[in-house]
């Protein structure tokens, strides 16, 4: 089993496509090494929260916005690499 990456997103806001784009990009970066799951909220929450190995790494509600820049993506990559190094 790979590193657990969990994305909680606002399903009612239509963020599923953003989740799927992020999932594909992470799978391309770490083929076969991640266990990615997404959960869309049925009510409007504005969520786009990314947890790596149970640790909150990215939070739209916390002011991070979407994972829409290379620097935001690299922050996730660094967290995943650290989790992989810990085994």
From Swiss-Prot:
Location(s), subcellular:
Cytoplasm
* Crosslink feature (Cysteinyl-selenocysteine (Cys-Sec)) location: 10-13
In terms of SUPFAM superfamilies, this protein maps to:
Thioredoxin-like (SSF52833)
Q: Which keywords belong to this entry?
A: Antioxidant, Cytoplasm, Glutathionylation, Redox-active center, Selenocysteine
Q: What does this protein do?
A: Plays a role as a glutathione (GSH)-dependent antioxidant. May be involved in a redox-related process. May play a role in the myopathies of selenium deficiency.
Report the family membership: Belongs to the SelWTH family. Selenoprotein W subfamily.
Q: What is this protein called in UniProt? A: Selenoprotein W
């Amino acid at each position: 089993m790979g590193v657990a990456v969990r994305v909680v997103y606002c399903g009612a806001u239509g963020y599923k496509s953003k989740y799927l784009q992020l999932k594909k990009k992470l799978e391309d970066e770490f083929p076969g090494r991640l266990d990615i799951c997404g959960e869309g909220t049925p009510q409007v929450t504005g969520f786009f929260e990314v947890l790596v190995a149970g640790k909150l790494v990215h939070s739209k509600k916390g002011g991070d916005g979407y994972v829409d820049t290379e620097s935001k993506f690299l922050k996730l990559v660094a967290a995943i690499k650290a989790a992989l190094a810990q085994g």
